[in-house]
Amino acid sequence: MQVRIFLSWCHRNADLKKALLADLLPVLGIFTDLEVEWWEDSHLTCGEEFLPGILDRLDEADFGLLLLSTHYFASEFIRQHELPRFAGPAADRGSLPVALAPLPEFRAEHDLGGVERQLVFTSGSRSFAELSGHRRTTFANDLAGSIRRRALAENGYRSL
């Protein structure tokens, strides 16, 4: 099965994003039952219009991998153009929310665009940024497995 994933992230988290993808992308690439096509804004080409280029890729995506942080939720661009496609009442694409950095407690006084109603991927309630060494690799491996199960709709009942 083929799946298209749009990477939604805040540029202030570039180092964390790079570290996560260094371990995540190779694992996604070795699945035999899932072919992942990946897109992020760095794939825009010279002369391409920024906003239409991003909106077109959003339209083509099956899922959005949301790399969550306080900077992510504070980004006006993300809140206006990307997040509504993956969370909240107007969402029309699958969401794969990941705690890239520590997040505020999901409380009524925080506007998290609907993500607060979704299961956010963590490692034992810890974000990727809170881990180091082999624990980061394990985080990426487990995230790849979670992405695979969601893409293949293997999130239902299981035999005992």
Locate predicted features:
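C-terminal interaction surface of TIR/SEFIR-family domains
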Residues: M1-A22, P26, F50, E60, ...
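General secondary-structure edge motif
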Residues: R4, E37-W38, L66, A90, ...
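Extended hydrophobic secondary-structure segments that form protein cores and membrane-embedded regions
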Residues: I5-F6, V36-H43, P97-P102
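A generic short-segment signal for beta-strand/edge and adjacent turn/coil regions
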Residues: L7-C10, D33-V36, G64-T70
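Alpha-helix termini
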Residues: L25-D33, G88-D92, E154-R158
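Short His-Asn-centered micro-motif
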Residues: E40-D41, L67-L68, L112-V115
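Conserved beta-strand-loop-alpha-helix hinge of the TIR/SEFIR fold
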Residues: L55-R107
